[in-house]
């Protein structure tokens, strides 16, 4: 079995699928399913559709962390609202770096929010859109006009951050980013390194 569509059914769990290692795509949208882990480590699995199910962000992040090559499509309406609210220059940056079309499909939107690397342009002033990129690992904000790192607070997968030549002065939003391994704050306005104490 390669494709399974159980959309709109009364199915509540996926435990009976755990041995189906040839599954490529599963659609469980509009169901009461909350747990994706029975699909964990299926080597051929590439997409899971779970809009309007009980699958939440915490479950999705856990599953993606364990299965980085699987695209999990969920909460698409909220994602589309976020995308439509972005300024056009942010859309250009994200579609260019995620290598998607300028009018991304729902699959491409989910690819965008799961990018691992991002470098922003020098004229960018607001980092808020980055807060949605919770799987990002390498972020380069150098030479930008960004002066506030607050949107980075929840980016727990961040490993490398470059804010060289910016007006950043406060590192407090980085204090809980336990995976951060590299930080470049050359030519910034940072005075205190105290927020880095427990990293």
Q: Residue ranges of each PLM-predicted region?
A:
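N-terminal capping/linker segments that flank leucine-rich repeat
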Residues: 3, 16, 21, 38-140, ...
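Per-repeat beta-strand-to-loop junction in leucine-rich repeat
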Residues: 5-8, 27-30, 51-52, 75, ...
């Amino acid at each position: 079995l390669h494709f399974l569509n159980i959309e709109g059914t009364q199915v509540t769990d996926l435990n009976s699928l755990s041995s189906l290692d040839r599954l490529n795509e599963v659609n469980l949208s509009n169901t009461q399913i909350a747990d994706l882990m029975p699909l964990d480590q299926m080597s051929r699995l590439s997409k899971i559709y779970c809009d309007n199910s009980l699958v939440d962000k915490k479950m999705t992040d856990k599953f993606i962390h364990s299965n980085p090559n699987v695209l999990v499509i969920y909460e698409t309406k909220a994602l589309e609202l976020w995308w439509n609210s972005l300024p056009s220059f942010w859309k250009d940056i994200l579609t260019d770096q995620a290598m998607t079309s300028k009018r991304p499909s729902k699959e491409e939107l989910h690819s965008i929010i799961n990018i691992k690397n991002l470098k922003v342009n020098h004229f960018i002033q607001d980092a808020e859109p980055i807060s949605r990129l919770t799987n990002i690992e390498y972020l380069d904000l150098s030479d930008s006009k960004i002066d506030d790192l607050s949107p980075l607070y929840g980016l727990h997968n961040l490993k490398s951050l470059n804010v060289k030549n910016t007006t950043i002065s406060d590192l407090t939003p980085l204090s809980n980013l336990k995976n951060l391994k590299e930080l470049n704050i050359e030519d910034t306005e940072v005075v205190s390194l105290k927020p880095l104490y427990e990293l």
